[in-house]
């Protein structure tokens, strides 16, 4: 399953080589890569934004804690995006759906998650930004070994040049393979880089 998820993510990335934004972040045991851009680059004539990404977390094989198992999580989502109309601030948001494919230890599954994202920049401090996203799939929208899924993150970024920003943030991923099992699959701070094309 890990090979299938990785191949699907690479194929999505390759087809969208002209994406508007490439995002990569790391922490001590996980890496997340994502591409996002106008949905019309994937499906001609369609408005909105696409978002494709992959998280890989290396588990600790000798740990008795179930949350320390390997995690491979891929997603592809679509969002309706726009300006939120905040006076005196540059603020945008999006709402949409995300198809998620997860492989955690011996459990594999999929989910259809609902959620959204936001980005905020204040006038006079345009180089500083606050952004975040959150997605949730309850049991009714989770399939195979996956009983529920949620993922959220919050980042503070500094725009080094117009096409590149660095950021620090926090992300939590909950992938629940059993009704009463552990759900926390990735949790912690990260450092990242965003490149716009």
Stretch-by-stretch model annotation:
Residues 6-7, 45, 61, 102, ...:
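General helical structural elements
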Residues 2-3, 57-58, 67, 87, ...:
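Context-gated lysine
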Residues 1-18:
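Gram-negative bacterial Sec-dependent N-terminal signal peptides
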Residues 2-3, 76-79:
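Long, low-complexity, intrinsically disordered N-terminal extensions of eukaryotic proteins, enriched
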